[in-house]
Amino acid sequence: MTRTYNIDQIKQVMGKLDVTKYIEEGFVAYSQGRVVVPPVGELIFEKPPGDVHIKYGYIKEDDYFAIKIASGFYENFKIDLPTSDGLILLFSQRDGTLVSILLDECYLTNVRTAVAGRVVAKYMAPSKIDCMGVFGTVVQGRMQVEYLKPVIDCSAIIVWGLHQDNLDTYQRDMEKLGYTVQTTRDAAEVTEKCRLIITATPAQAPLIDVKQIKPGTHITAMGSDTHLKQELDPKILQRADMVVADSIEQCLTRGEISKALQAGLIKKEDLIELGDVIAGRQSGRTSDEQITVADLTGVAVQDIQIAKAVHEALIQSDIGSV
């Protein structure tokens, strides 16, 4: 029997889950070659600007396979609508039947993306962070910071954005959560003061120049998830002591790594995959003076893992489907 759950039911069980454990295990399985993930399906729109990603796959010898559809329409804030929406379909790997429809409205995608940022910071952030820099004022610009709490002891933020109204709203909302927030429209102000920087925008041209990066800086770049998007000067990756990809194969054609590769600034063999760092097959940050970059383009194994965890928690909690 197919069960259908809405976002409110999904949120009821999230507090019971160790999502970080599931996501880390997924990345490790992926880097070990135990995950089947076809190329990302996508639709890109111009007027209004937006994109839809279709990500799907399975872990070998697991119980399920998943298909996720997630949309992002970045000007929806102008018409008082969420900038993202979506759902995940979970099927049995044994007989192909649809077991669960998770009407999460992109909530699970946002959670698994924020958790990936937490995992990256755990292995790659400098030991002392006085201020966090954030590029982007919407969902991931907020969630990335909130999900860092278990691994980063810092409550000061400098946030960059294009629209002052959005910056003001971000400042007001995050200060209610206990953060100290400074807003800016000058990227250099962020890079000057922050050694941990998160980029979470749909930009299609670099926001940060290589000359602005200070020794000891870590950047988690997660906004560039299509071949059109770009947030970093490719020379930043050339200068970095360590460049980590959530999926090397996927980052060959999308994200910041693809731009640096196309420019001949880095080589594929210089890249490290996140799952190998988690598993201890590769080292994370080894010095507070290193410049490190993580390119998170979003991998289907994250969707598989979080959908599986939520589905099983909902069954165990005996929450009825809608």
Predicted regions and their residues:
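Adenosine-phosphate binding glycine-rich loop
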Residues: 228-322
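NAD(P)-binding Rossmann-fold cofactor-contacting core
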Residues: 150-177
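N-terminal Rossmann-fold NAD(P) dinucleotide-binding loop
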Residues: 141-142
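Short helix-loop-beta connector
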Residues: 124-131, 153, 214-215
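Rossmann-like adenosine-cofactor binding region
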Residues: 179-260, 265
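Conserved beta-strand elements of the Class I
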Residues: 132-133, 292
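Glycine-rich Rossmann-fold phosphate-binding loop(s) that bind the pyrophosphate
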Residues: 137-138
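N-terminal ligand-binding/catalytic initiation module
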Residues: 1-110, 116-118, 125-128, 301-304, ...
